[in-house]
């Protein structure tokens, strides 16, 4: 079974600003969820949260998602995603 990194644990580990927590959570759910309905709801939520953010904040949120995903891959014994050095 995969190791799971709880959202609060990830936010603390990577010091995600509270302003970005909602969109980072929604993006993570949209990527990780196996349930199509839940995935679509998460995408809609992410789009809603994105309306309140600047382009720089969106890029920052994306970089946190990549960092968290790579950390999850690492704790599950996988190598980091390629092409994400600048994220």
Predicted regions and their residues:
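Intrinsic disorder/low-complexity segments in short proteins, especially the signal peptide
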Residues: 10, 25, 32, 56-58, ...
